[in-house]
Design a protein with these regions (language model features):
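Non-Sec secretion/translocation targeting segments of pathogen effectors
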Residues: 1-43
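An exposed, glycine/acidic-rich loop-and-rim segment of catalytic or binding clefts
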Residues: 38-406
């Protein structure tokens, strides 16, 4: 059953008790996007700007960058290419507005060197599919195997949602991106109408809603792949995220995986392991622990299972804070799990320059990616498979809530 999207989330709400009120669903009517040059739109202290983000070489299309700014000066930059978050700026403890995400200055690096899927909308299916194969209604589908030396399909493949140019519509308090995936495009069945809606409120909460419909039963598992560094986006050097303090309050298990991060179907109780963040820990104190699952991934890159998940309630998945800036990040979702990733595979010499002019190195950011469990379609013990039935609606939500440490 789909839930209503609530743009009025407040920091003092207890996440597991939040009631989603239907009267708020898209109460702000869309404004026709007729802007050709940079445009300003203000509502209740909100400002939305649009400008060019460069030309996409493969298609010749133009990419655009939208910036939503709230009355506090917090903002989010969103590119039509990949429906991507290219920057999030929020106030620190001294009142300075700083960028806290990885990103690039124009579309070219996202198209030519999509290192780490930075900020992108991942789909049709996030994470890995073993062998790139799955069955729906006894029909077997073979996807591109673009990972692990051609043995797995990862993050929707090389032509996934994060490298498509989405259409954009300006809303009163956000942006709606839409993309139509054709039947069998990239190997996935169904003509899929996908939407990603970003809304920034005046409490510095960024709401992300994912919606999709299909004319055939298909696989849908969308997420966002933003890399956060709450010390500031300019901190690109190796291990620069390891002073972050992390709490994962509502997860008592992770999905156990093999050496290429395909789930075995077993659940690992995290008690007395380095994966237990039910009490907050500084990353540098646990990331190099002697545990097989941690060694396999060269740092944190695990799927955490969210306790008390019901598919409707926004549950507090993770909390992150920086002692340097005082910035806090709370992540909430109504998805069953999330991938916690500490950018262990960044730092390749071929990657492009960042928006600050340097290159992002290993462990210079962290990702919290709410989603269905990896390879769920092929794993008997995983209840939810990520199958979207023809004519039904996929409707899930992520909230990134920013604050200042008290």
């Amino acid at each position: 059953m789909p839930i209503d999207f609530n743009p009025h989330f407040y920091n003092n709400i207890q996440p597991q008790q939040q009631i989603i009120n239907p009267q708020y669903m898209f109460q702000n009517q869309p404004i026709k996007d007729t802007f050709i040059k940079s445009a300003d739109v203000k509502f209740d202290g909100m400002k939305i700007e649009k400008k060019s983000f460069g030309k996409i070489e493969k298609t010749g299309e133009k990419a655009y960058l939208y910036t939503i700014t709230n009355k506090n000066g917090a903002s989010v930059n969103l590119s039509t290419f990949g429906a991507t978050i290219t920057g999030i700026k929020v106030p620190d403890k001294d009142g300075n507005i700083i960028d806290v995400t990885h990103g690039y200055n124009d579309v070219t690096p996202y198209e030519k060197s999509p290192v780490g899927h930075a900020g992108g909308t991942i789909g049709p299916c996030a994470n890995k599919i073993d062998g790139g194969k799955f069955k729906i209604n006894d029909q077997e589908y073979q996807l591109e195997c673009n990972k692990d030396n051609g043995s797995t399909h990862s993050h929707g493949g090389s032509e996934g949602f994060d490298v498509q140019n989405w259409k954009a519509k300006i809303l009163r308090d956000g942006i709606e991106f839409s993309y139509i995936k054709k039947d069998m495009e990239n190997g996935y069945p169904g003509n899929v109408k996908a939407k990603v809606i970003y809304k920034l409120d005046n409490d510095n909460n960024l709401h992300i809603q994912y919606k999709a419909t299909s004319d055939k039963d298909t696989l849908i598992n969308m997420t966002n792949h933003t890399y956060f560094n709450l010390d500031g986006a300019e901190n690109t050097e190796e291990n620069s995220v390891l002073d972050h303090i992390v709490e994962i309050p509502n997860s008592s298990t992770i999905t156990k995986t093999n050496k290429i991060s395909i789930p075995t179907g077993e659940f690992l109780n995290i008690k007395d392991t380095p994966f237990d963040f039910r009490e907050e820990k500084k990353l540098k104190n646990v990331i190099n622990s002697d545990h097989e699952q941690l060694k396999n991934t060269k740092g944190f890159d695990q799927n955490y299972c969210i306790d008390n998940y019901d598919g409707k309630t926004l549950i507090e998945a993770a909390n992150v804070r920086s002692e340097k800036t005082g910035i806090t990040l709370k992540v909430l979702t109504n998805l069953p799990g999330f991938q916690f990733y500490t950018a262990n595979n960044l730092g390749k010499s071929s990657q492009p320059e960042s928006k600050s002019g340097s290159r992002y190195e290993k462990r210079s950011g962290l990702c919290i990616e709410p989603q269905f469990y990896p390879n769920a379609i092929n794993t008997e013990s995983f209840k939810e498979k990520g199958i979207l039935k023809a004519g039904e609606e996929y409707n899930r939500e992520i909230v990134y809530s920013f604050g200042i440490e008290e």
